[in-house]
């Protein structure tokens, strides 16, 4: 398995990761996504308290190369956003699985996480694309 794909996270086909943290799920973009985007210059975040829907856009990430939509891996309520990205959006590039997280969602059904890909499935997706 690739070193840059943490085994303790879940993944989406849109190259986002999800980490269960208590009753909520922290979401960010993968190493692959940030490398494809290039230097991130802006991240549009949803409002805390807003509802996000699985597979639907919840934000935008802009880089020197492209503007890409961010899609929610789960349906639920946004309980926290990474306000630090307003001043330092490049944190998505330098620490995508840590300080570069994007939102924290309280899922309406915690079992939704089980439907996401594990690291092995995500690695296979990357190898086949």
Swiss-Prot record:
GO cellular component, one term: glycine cleavage complex
Cofactor binding: number and manner: Binds 1 lipoyl cofactor covalently.
Name of the protein in its database record: Glycine cleavage system H protein
N6-lipoyllysine modifications at: 65
Family label: Belongs to the GcvH family.
NCBIfam families: gcvH, PRK01202.1
GO biological process, one term: glycine decarboxylation via glycine cleavage system
Disulphide connectivity of cysteines: none
Cofactor: (R)-lipoate
Presence of keyword Membrane: no
Residue ranges annotated for the Lipoyl-binding domain, each copy included: 24-106
Record text on subunit structure and interactions: The glycine cleavage system is composed of four proteins: P, T, L and H.
Cross-referenced InterPro entries: 2-oxoA_DH_lipoyl-BS, Biotin_lipoyl, GCV_H, GCV_H/Fam206, GCV_H_sub, Single_hybrid_motif
Annotated function: The glycine cleavage system catalyzes the degradation of glycine. The H protein shuttles the methylamine group of glycine from the P protein to the T protein.
Lineage: Bacteria, Pseudomonadati, Myxococcota, Myxococcia, Myxococcales
Keyword line: Lipoyl
